[in-house]
Regions:
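Beta-sheet-rich non-transmembrane sensory/scaffold domains
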Residues: 2-622
Length: 622
């Protein structure tokens, strides 16, 4: 870590050191420091101190003034004569390194690890974790269907022979969003209208589906990231980037030195209102609930998690003074990961945004325990490599498992690493390296004692990794086949479907494909059948798993398919599993550019609702 002890103490702002340093900087710039707009809220944190287990890697500051000083100090390093400035531009993600090393394979012919079946949530959404519902544009209670299209909510009765529209409700100031459903309340989370990043949280009473009523609206001055529903608790993650300031650029009247000094004065005069989110004019998070990372390379911004129960106007909040969009929720954990640093083009000259610095090829991890409305910091750590997205993380029995892609800090391979929570730190417990030499991770699926990882460059290695002993993860087997799977869906202990792209032997992709795998023997993985779709097609589940639906009673998978490389037709591909084979039937369901809106929602009656841009109808699976 390129940080001296003085630098660390300044970033953590423990005591008065950071306050003094920033005050001197502000004084030198000719600007009087301003405190927070609100009275010091140090003792107002609901639910106790969320950082009572804070470590040196992530800790709250000593006061609101110290928190503001830490923001200002870090921001002054990012400002220049053109405003917020980036560094020299290059990609610090997967890098085409070369090597001949091979992964070690575990010996033995049997394994404890097994796959298990994944099903849609009770509200009809294909989710990552069982029991943790995810937002979507369509939700159901099996009697009614609720659809959000832009700012319009439409309710339907789906208990009869055909869906019947019941009501429409316009949601004011909402540009686009998604929903969570709990009992008779919908919670809509989405982007508000206007130029400034805003998250709208709208609660709607749908106890009378024919007359939905808005019961509460919250406006958060931050951009939406994601949301989850745990039992009756909604958690919404929002982010604040670098603030919009009235920066000046060099011109005939002002040179670079003058522009830089002007811009530095603006940064030094920022208040907490510029860095922290507000809800309807009030501070959304207390100073005591905001922690500052130790790592000086961490992106500057604020990531806030809001927790509340639908119908209750109170919330609890916790925040980390960084910016990322990678958030993974398990049943009792929230894990945040910083994104790999990357950029391209000429040096950045922006008024505001996420500025990606060159970084060091490491990923920072922050783990929180979820208990009711409380979101409590548990541990933080650092790993070498890049975490692509939330699907690259998993949590089981207090162990965080991550799939890591290549960066400048790693070898020319991918890895699976397990980490323990120990005294506020995430400590590496075990690892498997040398997965996919010179290849990129395309998909990951986790189970209690197993990870399935797909990498690709010219061939598609599918790796099975035994995680039953977190301190000694083992590579059980691998399968190399053309093409690759971008989404893996387990059907049970013996079968798995992969949705992705077919490819030529040289790695050139040709079109979408669906593959059926036999995973009953993890030391001998087999692809038993493959459906290859027409050239230049794409499968929606490859980028949005909510466009995949598994119907266990019918032994049928439904996936959305488009020809949007050069056309505008959307199909539903019904894949019936018959032993080791796939029987495919394709139905054109929509035309136009809105293929991403198509959903296939299973009902408890056995029917499936097809939602397109134009209509809502029942889909004939047979």
């Amino acid at each position: 870590m390129n940080s001296s002890p003085v630098r660390r103490s300044a970033l953590l702002a423990v005591g008065t050191v950071a306050t003094l340093v920033t005050a001197l900087c502000v004084w030198a710039l000719g600007v009087q420091p301003e405190g927070p707009d609100d009275p010091d809220p140090w003792d107002r944190t609901l639910g106790g101190n969320p950082f009572r287990l804070a470590s040196t890697a992530l800790a709250p500051t000593a006061s609101c003034d110290a928190l503001l000083d830490s923001y200002r100090e870090r921001a002054l390093e990012l400002v220049g004569p053109w405003g917020w400035e980036g560094q020299e531009y290059y990609f610090d993600g997967p890098t085409p390194l070369r090597g001949d090393a091979a992964a070690d394979t575990a010996s033995g012919t049997t394994a404890r690890a097994r796959t298990s079946r994944a099903e849609s949530s009770e509200t009809g959404t294909n989710v990552q974790e069982s029991g943790v519902d995810e937002p979507d544009t369509v939700k159901t209670d099996s009697q009614h269907l609720f659809r959000l299209h832009g700012s319009q909510l439409t309710t339907y009765d789906v208990s009869g022979a055909a869906p019947v529209e019941l009501a429409r409700l316009r949601l004011p100031d909402l540009q686009t969003g998604e929903m969570l459903l709990h009992d008779d309340r919908l919670v809509v989370i989405g982007a508000g209208r206007g130029n400034d990043p805003t998250t709208k949280i709208i609660t709607i009473d749908v106890s009378e589906a024919a007359a939905p009523q808005i019961t509460e609206t919250r406006s958060v001055t931050a951009a939406p990231v994601t949301a989850r529903l745990h039992d009756d608790v909604v958690r919404v993650v929002v982010r604040n980037g670098l603030p919009e300031l009235d920066f000046r650029h060099p011109d005939d009247r002002r040179g670079e030195v003058g522009a830089r000094r002007h811009n530095e004065r603006l940064v030094a005069a920022t208040t907490l209102a510029d860095w922290l989110p507000h809800i309807d004019g009030e501070s959304a998070v207390d100073c005591a609930a905001v922690a500052v990372p130790e790592d000086p390379d961490t992106e500057l911004g604020t990531l806030t998690t809001l927790a509340f129960t639908p119908g209750d106007d109170q919330h609890r909040a916790v925040a980390v003074a960084t910016e990322t969009e990678i958030a993974y929720f398990s049943g009792n954990r929230l894990h945040l990961a910083t994104a790999p640093s990357w950029s391209w083009g000429p040096p950045a000259r922006t008024t505001s945004s996420l500025i990606r610095s060159p970084g060091n090829g490491h990923t920072q991890l922050y783990s929180f325990e979820l208990d009711g409305l409380d979101t409590t910091f548990i541990a933080a750590g650092e790993v070498k490599g890049a975490i692509a997205d939330r699907w690259s993380m998993d949590s089981a029995d207090g162990v965080l498992r991550v799939a890591l892609g290549r960066t400048l800090a790693t070898g020319n391979f991918n890895s699976v690493v397990t980490l323990d929570e120990q005294d506020g730190r995430l400590v590496e417990r075990g690892r498997v390296d040398k997965l996919g030499i010179d290849e990129e991770i395309k998909s990951v699926r986790w189970f209690d004692d197993l990870a399935l990882v797909v990498t690709f460059r010219e061939m598609d290695p599918l790796y099975a990794i035994d995680l039953s002993q977190p301190s000694e993860p083992k590579l059980l087997g691998e399968l190399k086949i053309p093409g690759f799977s971008q989404y893996l869906h387990p059907l049970g202990p013996e079968r798995m479907i992969g949705i992705g792209q077919a490819a030529e032997p040289d790695g050139t992709t040709t079109g979408a494909q669906a593959a059926l795998f036999n995973v009953s023997d993890l030391t001998n993985l087999r692809r038993t059948d493959v459906v290859t779709y027409p050239e230049r097609t794409q499968a929606g589940a490859a980028t949005d798993p909510r466009q995949f639906t598994w119907l266990p009673e019918q032994r049928t998978a439904l996936t959305v398919l488009t020809d949007n490389w050069d056309g505008r037709t959307t199909w539903v591909s019904a894949l019936k599993v018959r032993g080791s084979k796939l029987q495919e039937k394709r139905t054109a369901v929509a035309y136009g550019a809105d293929a991403s809106l198509v959903r296939l929602v299973p009902l408890s009656s056995g029917k499936v609702v097809l939602v397109t841009d134009d209509e809502v109808s029942f889909f004939d699976v047979d």
